[in-house]
C-alpha cells in the first residue's frame, strides 16, 4: 500500500491565538519532531506568563457578550465548525500521524471521535435546560436554571492531541463559557488547525484562545484567579499532586483524568481465534500510549482443572505471541502499517527500562520488542515492536505500574474471584474488560470491579461522546467527567430562583 503525502512541507512555527489574533510568542522555540523519521517538522514556543495572562484577559472580556448570545446562535458556530472539520478530515488525521506517530487509521479514528463531541455539543440548548415547579407554596414558584461559569483552562496530553481537547472545548463554548487551551507542546498543530477552523466558522474573538507552552504555562493557568475551572488529562503524579491540589487551593472546578493499569480477563468459554485480533488492538494500538490500553491479560481457569487451565493459558500465550509478532511496525502514513513509534526517544527509553525490570524480576520474556523490525528503512530511535511477558504476576513492577508502551503481561488466575481480587489490588481504576459468553460472570465483573469503564467482550471500552468518560481511584480526580451530561454540569452553575409576585 502507498505511503500517503505529509500534510505540510517545511518547518512551521506555530503561533498563539489570543483574542482572535494570531500572535508570535516571545518565548523560546522548541522543535516539533516527527517520531517516525526524527525530522524537525515545526517549532513551538514556550510562551511567557504575560502571554498567558493576555489570553485569560481576552477570554474574560469575551465572556459577557458570549454568555448573552442565544444558545442556538452559539451552537450554529459549532454546526459550521463540524462541517469544516469534515472537509479537513484527512488533513487533521495526517497532522496527528506526522506529529504523534500513530497510524493513519488510528488518527482517522481519533478525528472521528473528536468531531462526534462537537456534534453532541450542538444539542446543548435542550440539554442545559433547567426545570421548574409551580406553587411550592401558595403563589410561589421555584425554578432551576443552568448558567455559564466563566473562563476555563484546558490542559490535554500528548497521546490524543486532537480528541482530548474536544472532550471539553465544544461543551464549554456551547454552554456560554470561554476557553484558554494549552495544547501538548509535543504535537500541537492539530489544535492550531482547530482554532483556524473555529475562526473561519465565525467564533467571536476571545471565546477560544490558544497558548503554547510547557509546565510553566500550565502552572500559571492553575494559579490564575480568573480561570474558574481546569480540564486536565495526564499522569496521576501531575493530576493529583499538582492540578487537583493546586487548582483546589484556588477554588477551581477540576476534571483530572490520570494514569491507568487496565486488566483484560479471558474466561475459558471464549472463542480464542475471534478474541485475539481484539486483544492486539487493546494492548498494542496507539503503541500502548493510551489510558485504555490493555496491560495485564488475566487468563482465568474458572471451572477448569489445574491441568486444563494450564493448557488454556499456554494456548493463549502461544497464539497471542504468534499474532503479535506479525504486527507491521513503521511510519503511520504507510497504510499497511499497524503500529507506529512511541512519541519520542525518552518515552522509548522509559518503556525499555520497564522491559528490563520485568526480566530482572523473573517474568518470562516471550516476545522482545527491543529487537526492532520495521516495514521500511527508518531510524529506530522511537520504535519498539510488541513485547509480551508471561509467568509473572500483577505484583511485579510491570504488573503494577503504568508502562504506557506496547508491553503485555499475561498472568494466571484460578478463579474469577481471584481475578477480580487482582484487579481490585491495583491503585488504578480506569478500565477493565472480560471476554466470556457467560452472563453471570460478566455481571460479576461489572458489579464488583472498581473502574470507570467496563468492557464486556470489548477490549477497549472507548470514550463515546454521548457518555461521560473517566476512571476511579488513582485514575481520576474530581467529581464530574468530560463528555456527555457530566460535561454540561461541569461547565454550568446551577441557580435556584424562588419567586412570588405581590
Predicted feature locations:
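ALDH superfamily catalytic-core signature
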Residues: 229, 237-393, 456, 501
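Hydrophobic face of amphipathic alpha-helices that form TPR/SEL1-like repeat modules
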Residues: 1-36, 370
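Residue-level signal for inorganic ion chemistry
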Residues: 38, 74, 96, 118, ...
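A short hydrophobic/small-residue beta-strand
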Residues: 178-180, 365, 453
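Glycine-rich loop-to-alpha-helix module at the N-terminal edge of alpha/beta enzyme cores
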Residues: 39-129, 139
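Short, well-ordered beta-strand elements within core beta-sheets of diverse protein domains
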Residues: 41-47, 62-68, 154, 264-266, ...
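Conserved C-terminal structural/oligomerization subdomain of aldehyde/semialdehyde dehydrogenase
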Residues: 39-42, 203, 227, 265, ...
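Rossmann-like NAD(P) dinucleotide-binding subdomain of oxidoreductase/dehydrogenase enzymes
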Residues: 130-276, 309, 413, 478
Amino acid at each position: 500500500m502507498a505511503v500517503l503525502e505529509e500534510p505540510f512541507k517545511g518547518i512551521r512555527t506555530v503561533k498563539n491565538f489570543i483574542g482572535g489574533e494570531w500572535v508570535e510568542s516571545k518565548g523560546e522555540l522548541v522543535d516539533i519532531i516527527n517520531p517516525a523519521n526524527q525530522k524537525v517538522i515545526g517549532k513551538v514556543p514556550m510562551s511567557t506568563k504575560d502571554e498567558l495572562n493576555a489570553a485569560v484577559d481576552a477570554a474574560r472580556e469575551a465572556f459577557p457578550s458570549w454568555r448573552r448570545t442565544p444558545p442556538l446562535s452559539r451552537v450554529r458556530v459549532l454546526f459550521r465548525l463540524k462541517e469544516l472539520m469534515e472537509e479537513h478530515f484527512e488533513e487533521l488525521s495526517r497532522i496527528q500521524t506526522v506529529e504523534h506517530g500513530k497510524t493513519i487509521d488510528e488518527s482517522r479514528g481519533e478525528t472521528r471521535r473528536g468531531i462526534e463531541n462537537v456534534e453532541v455539543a450542538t444539542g446543548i440548548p435542550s440539554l442545559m435546560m433547567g426545570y421548574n415547579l409551580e406553587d411550592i407554596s401558595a403563589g410561589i414558584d421555584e425554578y432551576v436554571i443552568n448558567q455559564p461559569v466563566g473562563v476555563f483552562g484546558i490542559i490535554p496530553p500528548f497521546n490524543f492531541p486532537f480528541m482530548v481537547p474536544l472532550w471539553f472545548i465544544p461543551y464549554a463554548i456551547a454552554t456560554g463559557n470561554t476557553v484558554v487551551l494549552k495544547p501538548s507542546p509535543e504535537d500541537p498543530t492539530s489544535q492550531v488547525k482547530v482554532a483556524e477552523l473555529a475562526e473561519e466558522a465565525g467564533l467571536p474573538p476571545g471565546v477560544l484562545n490558544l497558548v503554547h507552552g510547557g509546565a510553566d504555562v500550565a502552572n500559571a493557568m492553575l494559579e490564575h484567579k480568573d480561570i474558574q475551572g481546569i480540564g486536565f488529562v495526564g499522569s496521576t503524579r501531575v493530576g493529583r499532586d499538582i492540578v487537583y491540589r493546586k487548582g483546589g487551593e484556588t477554588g477551581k472546578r477540576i476534571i483530572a483524568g490520570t494514569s491507568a493499569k487496565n486488566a483484560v480477563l479471558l474466561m475459558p468459554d471464549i472463542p480464542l481465534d475471534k478474541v485475539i485480533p481484539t486483544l492486539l488492538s487493546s494492548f498494542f494500538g496507539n503503541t500502548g500510549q493510551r489510558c485504555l490500553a490493555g496491560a495485564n491479560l488475566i487468563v482465568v481457569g474458572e471451572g477448569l482443572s489445574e491441568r486444563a487451565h494450564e493448557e488454556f493459558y499456554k494456548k493463549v500465550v502461544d497464539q497471542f505471541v504468534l499474532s503479535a509478532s506479525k504486527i507491521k511496525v513503521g511510519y503511520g502514513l504507510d497504510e499497511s502499517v499497524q503500529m507506529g513509534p512511541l512519541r519520542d526517544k525518552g518515552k522509548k527509553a522509559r518503556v525499555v527500562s520497564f522491559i528490563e525490570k520485568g526480566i530482572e524480576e523473573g517474568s518470562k520474556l516471550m516476545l522482545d520488542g527491543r529487537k526492532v523490525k520495521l516495514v521500511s528503512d527508518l531510524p529506530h530511535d522511537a520504535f519498539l515492536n510488541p513485547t509480551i511477558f508471561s509467568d509473572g504476576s500483577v505484583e511485579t513492577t510491570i504488573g503494577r505500574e503504568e508502562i504506557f508502551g506496547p508491553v503485555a503481561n499475561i498472568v494466571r488466575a484460578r478463579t474469577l474471584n481471584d481475578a477480580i481480587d487482582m484487579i481490585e489490588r491495583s491503585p488504578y481504576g480506569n478500565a477493565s474488560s472480560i471476554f466470556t459468553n457467560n452472563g453471570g460472570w460478566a455481571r460479576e465483573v461489572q458489579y464488583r470491579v472498581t473502574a470507570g469503564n467496563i468492557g464486556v467482550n470489548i477490549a477497549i471500552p472507548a470514550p463515546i461522546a454521548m457518555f461521560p468518560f473517566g476512571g476511579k481511584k488513582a485514575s481520576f480526580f474530581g467529581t464530574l467527567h468530560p463528555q456527555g451530561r457530566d460535561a454540561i454540569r461541569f461547565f454550568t452553575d446551577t441557580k435556584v430562583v424562588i419567586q412570588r409576585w405581590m
